[in-house]
Amino acid sequence: MADYFATLTIPKNTIPPNISSTTVTIEGDILVGFYRLIPPGWAGLAHYRIKYGLEQLHPANEGAWDTGDNIRDFVPLNWKMPEHKLTLTIEGYNEDTSYDHTVYLWFRTEELEYARPTTLLKEILSLLKEIFGVEG
């Protein structure tokens, strides 16, 4: 399991097609999801989305943007990564005429062997067999 941190500060008056963007490189087999912090003050005026190449990962509906105000939560994705190491792009725009706004993101990845419950159960069974001296 690994966590990768990214921020995107979106300058005021940044309206599409003039958007801000940043990238984050992550490693793993499964992008479990991400924690997000949208600080107070956004008032729904700043917007962001997460993409892998041309594929939009969040929000799930293509062409949509996420926004909010004072949000701290985890967004599950459970996305099987097409490459073990890849780069995500975070894009944003800001309708606010007075302030820049920043979104804070922590991406959580896992290796496939740890993401599968059956692997964990096999490890537990193997450990129990070892503890109790059972062979096979």
Question: What is the meaning of each model-derived region?
Answer:
Residues 1-28, 38-136:
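Beta-strand-centric surfaces of beta-sandwich/beta-rich domains
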